[in-house]
């Protein structure tokens, strides 16, 4: 099982050109499934796994209170693996094709008000870490890029003259993301007054090209970024469950509330399908309903 799984991951990296972050998610999901089949059924070959075994795995996930979207993602990973193994003639048939995908719950994205965003962005201090964190928060909100996209930014991806970032999104698709004046000012402050101090901590002979650095002068991790965002959320006493992705949701929602065209927002977010962007129109409708019910005398 392990060798076939590793071959599949190499296929995703080499042939599909998927990002390290996406391949890592495939690895985690499929390793969990592999361990389940080993421990529960003593199955050690993918060719031995039937659709009934996969159903048991899905039932296990449901018992563990995994969200439907997470379960659907794990099943999708299994299907992709089985499709690959069938094509490579490592298994006789693709039994995963017999399973229906769990219906995803259509959750409205969590987003902040403009006032809450301002409080969050102004929470970091004036030390090197605070200047870095403020720049990170500004970039999230002003550009709407994903966590993985921000994490992967190098100095050469930033053009201060034009005010654009070159980001690599899902499927290794590159796009330009505009930065507003506030984000540019925060980045310049970080570049001139904080990044050089952090870079001094780097013991490596080679310079680090990463835009955002940690206390060791190397690229900050995605986990650390999440942790820093959570810290400032707690400081501002926000009632929302805020993550870096919440700032992306806020970016899209505030653009639409300001009258932006849905197609333009799709381009800015890097969505392949406009149906993914349309969920933000539901957010606006929910907001309008709330305002109407609260303030209209005939509601």
Curated annotation (Swiss-Prot):
The active site is at residues 146, 170, 245, 248, 271, 280. CDD domains: INT_XerDC_C. GO terms for cellular component: cytoplasm. GO terms for molecular function: DNA binding; tyrosine-based site-specific recombinase activity. Residues 107-293 form the Tyr recombinase domain. Residues 1-86 form the Core-binding (CB) domain. It comes from the Bacteria. Keywords: Cell cycle, Cell division, Chromosome partition, Cytoplasm, DNA integration, DNA recombination, DNA-binding. It is found in: Cytoplasm. Its main location: cytoplasm. InterPro entries: CB (IPR044068), DNA_brk_join_enz (IPR011010), Integrase-like_cat_sf (IPR013762), Integrase_catalytic (IPR002104), Integrase_recombinase_N (IPR010998), Integrase_SAM-like_N (IPR004107), Recomb_XerC (IPR011931), Tyrosine_recombinase_XerC/XerD (IPR023009). GO terms for biological process: cell division; chromosome segregation; DNA transposition. Forms a cyclic heterotetrameric complex composed of two molecules of XerC and two molecules of XerD. Belongs to the 'phage' integrase family. XerC subfamily. Site-specific tyrosine recombinase, which acts by catalyzing the cutting and rejoining of the recombining DNA molecules. The XerC-XerD complex is essential to convert dimers of the bacterial chromosome into monomers to permit their segregation at cell division. It also contributes to the segregational stability of plasmids. This is Tyrosine recombinase XerC.
């Amino acid at each position: 099982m392990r060798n076939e799984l590793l071959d599949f991951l190499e296929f995703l990296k080499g042939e599909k050109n998927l990002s390290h972050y996406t391949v890592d998610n495939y690895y985690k999901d499929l390793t969990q499934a592999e361990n389940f089949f080993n421990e529960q059924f003593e199955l050690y070959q993918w060719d031995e796994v039937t659709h009934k075994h996969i159903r048991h795995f899905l039932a296990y996930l449901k018992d563990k209170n995994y969200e439907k979207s997470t379960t659907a993602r794990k099943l999708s990973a299994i299907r992709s693996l089985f499709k690959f193994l069938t094509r490579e003639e490592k298994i006789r048939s693709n039994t995963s094709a017999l399973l229906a995908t769990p219906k995803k719950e259509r959750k409205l994205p969590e987003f902040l008000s403009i006032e809450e965003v301002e409080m969050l962005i102004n929470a970091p201090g004036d030390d090197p870490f605070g200047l870095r964190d403020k720049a990170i928060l500004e970039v999230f909100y002003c550009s709407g890029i994903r966590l993985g996209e921000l994490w992967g930014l190098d100095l050469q991806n930033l053009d201060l003259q034009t005010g654009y970032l070159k980001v690599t999104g899902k499927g290794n698709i590159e796009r330009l993301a505009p930065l507003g004046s506030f984000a540019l000012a925060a980045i310049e402050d970080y570049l001139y007054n904080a990044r050089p101090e952090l870079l001094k901590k780097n013991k490596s002979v080679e310079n680090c090209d990463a835009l955002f650095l940690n206390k060791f002068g190397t690229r900050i991790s995605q986990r650390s970024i999440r942790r820093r965002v959570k810290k400032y959320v707690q400081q501002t006493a926000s009632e929302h469950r805020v993550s870096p992705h919440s700032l992306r949701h806020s970016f899209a929602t505030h653009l639409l509330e300001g009258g932006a065209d849905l197609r333009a927002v799709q381009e800015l977010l890097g969505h392949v399908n406009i149906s993914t962007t349309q969920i933000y129109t539901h957010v606006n409708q929910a907001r309008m309903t709330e305002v109407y019910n609260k303030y209209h005398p005939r509601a």
